Amino acid sequence: MIQSFTRLNVADNSGAKEIMAIKVLGGSKRRYASVGDVIVASVKKALPNGKVKKGQVVKAVVVRTKKEIQRENGSLIRFDDNAAVILDNKNEPIGTRIFGPVAREVRYKNFMKIVSLAPEVL
């Protein structure tokens, strides 16, 4: 459950380390984002030689949340942190590597490039 002003770790090598959610995309009064949802975010912490800079506004897809996700088979899955992957204008990841596990719900939202780069899909 990601909403405005939520801080998320960045799970790729785009150069950003932490982002803060500004808006949840999809719907005019949409409040929460879960795994697989796209958000607009501001970069709060970044590496000096990265592709994105501090203060830059980016789009990102949520790949892990602390709030549990209910699957269709009744099982629940939750992660230790809130994490996202930064996207470009064509909804492709900016980074070339993904760190940490990624939820299977990302595949259902057609982010296949993220799923193929991820070391583990849970």
UniProtKB/Swiss-Prot annotation:
Cite a single Pfam family from the UniProt record: Ribosomal_L14
Q: Which family does it belong to?
A: Belongs to the universal ribosomal protein uL14 family.
Q: Among the record's GO biological process terms, what is one?
A: translation
Q: Which GO terms describe its molecular function?
A: large ribosomal subunit rRNA binding; structural constituent of ribosome
Q: What does this protein do?
A: Binds to 23S rRNA. Forms part of two intersubunit bridges in the 70S ribosome.
InterPro entries reported in the protein's UniProt record: Ribosomal_uL14, Ribosomal_uL14_bac-type, Ribosomal_uL14_CS, Ribosomal_uL14_sf
Record key words, sorted: Ribonucleoprotein, Ribosomal protein, RNA-binding, rRNA-binding
Residue ranges spanning the membrane: these are none
Read off the CDD domains from this record. Ribosomal_uL14
Annotated protein name in UniProt = Large ribosomal subunit protein uL14
Q: How does it assemble?
A: Part of the 50S ribosomal subunit. Forms a cluster with proteins L3 and L19. In the 70S ribosome, L14 and L19 interact and together make contacts with the 16S rRNA in bridges B5 and B8.
GO CC entries? cytosolic large ribosomal subunit
